[in-house]
Structures are given as C-alpha cells and as structure tokens.
Amino acid sequence: MPTVDENFVKRIQPHSEEAERSVLGSMLMDRDAIVEAEDILTKEDFYQRQYGIVFEAMVELYREGKAVDLITLQNKLKEKQR
C-alpha cells in the first residue's frame, strides 16, 4: 500500500496552460502587465518549464529597458541558450 508521500508525488499539480499563455500574451502586449506579473510570479510558478523560461526572458528585457516584443524575445531566448 502506497504511503502518503508516494501518493503526493504521483499527484499532478493543478495548472492551466491557457492561463499561463494568457499571462505571457498580456506581458507582450502591455508593459504594465510585466510589472504586475513580476510582482507576483516567478519562473518556477509556471507548470510548463518553457513558459517559465519565456517569462524570465521577458522580465530580463524589461529590466534592461529594452522593448519586449517577439523579435527581442526571440533574440533573448537564443542568447540564453548559449
């Protein structure tokens, strides 16, 4: 019989891909959304690892005073892969 800890590990954490995509989309469209999201979220809050990486890159661009758009985001993500 599984222990409580084993049952906990097997359980999938609640998440919503749609909500995660909506947050990222809002951040692309509105710099104020970046400020709001940064105040309450970290990359670890995203269930989808890749969404957390995108979130982190967007916040970094914002902190660097750069435009946050598809081109700068793509370049930042490529830079982070190196």
Question: Model features per residue range: what roles?
Answer:
Residues 1-82:
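Noncatalytic partner-interaction/assembly domains of nucleic-acid and motor enzyme complexes
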